[in-house]
Every structure is written in C-alpha cells, then in structure tokens.
From Swiss-Prot:
It is found in: Cell inner membrane. InterPro entries: HtpX_protease, Pept_M48_protease_HtpX, Peptidase_M48. It comes from Hyphomonas neptunium (strain ATCC 15444). One of its GO terms (molecular function) is metalloendopeptidase activity. This is Protease HtpX homolog. It is a multi-pass membrane protein.
Length: 297
C-alpha cells in the first residue's frame, strides 16, 4: 500500500473521530477530538511498541536465556533479520496456546517481534522461520507504525462513540446518537481492515524471499488458522482493535474474505505462496533441514 493511501486511511479515521466529537460537544468537541487524535498519533509514534507489547502480555526473551528453544528461536530471528538487511529486533514471547505472532515498533531500529508459545509448540522450525520472516517484512516495509496508530485510533473511536449515546441527545437526538454509536466503530473497522488486508499479501511475498522458501510460510499459515479456531488468545480478545497486527486473525479462524475479516483468506494467501514457490522452482513440502532436529524436532 502506498504512503498516500495510508495517510488517506488515517485521515479518514481522524475525521470519524472528529465527527463523533462534534456530536458530543459541538465545534469545541470536534476541535478537542482532533487534538486528541493528533496526540494519540504522536504517542503511538514514540510508544507503539511498549503499548502493544504490554497489552498483549509479551515478555522479552533475552539473548542469554537458558531455555534452549527460545535461544534457538532468537538466533533464527537474528539470522533472518541479517538476510533482510535489518537490525536484529527485540524478541518477545506471549504465553498463550494459540499460535500467532506480530511485529511492532516505529522503525527498523526500534522494532520488536513477538510469538506465542503456541506458535513455537505447534510449528516446526522452518514454519516458525517463515512466520518471523513475514513479521520482519512488515518491519522492513515500515508497516508496524501505521498498524499501531490505526489500532490506537480504532479503539478510541469505539469508546468515544459509546459516549455519544449519553452526551449527544440534545444535539442530534437519541436516534442520531445510536446511529453514530453503531456506524462509527464499523467505519473505523473498515479502515483498519483495508490497511491490514492489503499489507498481508505484500508481507507474505517479501517474507518468503527473506526465508528463502514460500512453502514454509504457506504451511505455517494453515497450521495457525487451525490453531486459531481451537484456541483462545485472551490478550487479543481483551483488545480486539489490535487483531489486525497479528499474522492471522486471533479473534476467529474463518477463512473467507469477508467484509469484517481483519485478514485476507488464508486459502488465498497459501495459494499465492504456492504459486510463488512454483516460480522459484520449489515444489512439494520442504524437508526439514539439519537445524530442525533441535528444539522443534
């Protein structure tokens, strides 16, 4: 997605925020909403990684960890970052059985990647590498800042819309307040999804280039989708506005390209990756390498 389109989408979310502010407090409310939206963008610029990681219950994995699987995981991420020409990101783990992962940070120099314990336990080493290469692609494409700012505004719009029901009666009437309360979060969600869904395809392609085998990511996506259907991610459930940051929707496992899906269809993503593998002369399921005999087996 181009920079111009990203700014357009973020401007649309700010406009929604301002419209609700007008309903709640007239012109003064609209101006205040604009100031708050601008402040949230500035806050997200400097604190996006800390905010998201804290809300998702992520714990940093230090290089000297005694856990052999986590140590190998960190080494693999560092190797992938080197392949991509990126600084090694900080690495975090989220204690939840649902397999998933995300990246955050305002730029490659301040990036962080996080994986769930479910991801490391359910996927083999090549598949984990494919997932982390995808997340590093988001870092390289500088998607992480945009996605975090979008999540912040989307969550704030939902909360502000709820206030409209109680404070906007005199200005727009009860019916208008209810309409804003319903449709403003929906509009914010559509903007959020438009950002997420288009970027996932780009990150899939670049991630496959970083790890060297599109089939690793294709296989991982299929396993992650199955895991998302059967396992709950309590951190994502508590902050659904951040669902689009994960590699696969942590709130549901539906595989259709529906209007209110935060991610493209897994089947479509896998098909594109398999097509890419064919163009690279890679066929079948990649056999485990010698390094895969470690923690992942």
């Amino acid at each position: 997605m181009g920079t111009a389109k990203t700014f357009t989408l973020l401007a649309a979310m700010t406009a929604i925020f301002m419209a609700i502010g007008f309903l709640v407090g007239g012109m003064a409310g609209m101006i205040l909403a604009f100031v708050v939206a601008a402040g949230m963008n500035v806050f997200a610029w400097w604190n996006s990684d800390k905010m998201v990681l804290r809300m998702q219950g992520a714990q940093e994995v230090l290089p000297d960890t005694k856990n052999p699987m986590l140590r190998a995981f960190g080494e693999d991420v560092a190797r992938l970052a080197e392949n991509a020409g990126l600084p090694a990101p900080r690495i975090y783990i989220i204690d939840t059985p649902q397999p998933n992962a995300f990246a955050t940070g305002r730029n490659p120099q301040n990036a962080a990647v996080a994986a769930t314990t479910g991801l490391l336990n359910m996927l083999n080493r090549e598949e984990v590498a494919g997932v982390m290469a995808h997340e590093l692609a988001h870092v390289q494409n500088r998607d992480t800042l945009t996605m975090t700012v979008t999540a912040t505004l989307a969550g704030a719009i939902g909360m502000l819309a709820n206030f409209a029901l109680f404070f906007g009666r005199d200005r727009a009437g009860l019916i208008g307040s209810i309409a804003i309360m319903i449709f403003a979060p929906m509009a914010a969600a559509l903007v959020q999804m438009a950002i997420s869904r288009s970027r996932e395809y780009v990150a899939d392609k670049r991630g496959a280039e970083i790890c060297g085998n599109p089939l690793w990511l294709a296989s991982a996506l299929e396993k992650i989708e199955r895991g998302a259907r059967s396992q709950i991610n309590p951190y994502a459930e508590r902050s659904p506005a951040m669902a689009h940051m994960y590699i696969s929707n942590p709130l549901n496992g539906r595989g259709q390209d529906k209007l209110f899906s935060t991610h493209p269809s897994t089947a479509n993503r896998v098909e594109a990756l398999r097509r890419m593998a064919g163009e690279m002369g890679i066929s079948g399921v990649a056999a485990p390498t010698a390094r895969s005999s470690g923690p992942w087996g």
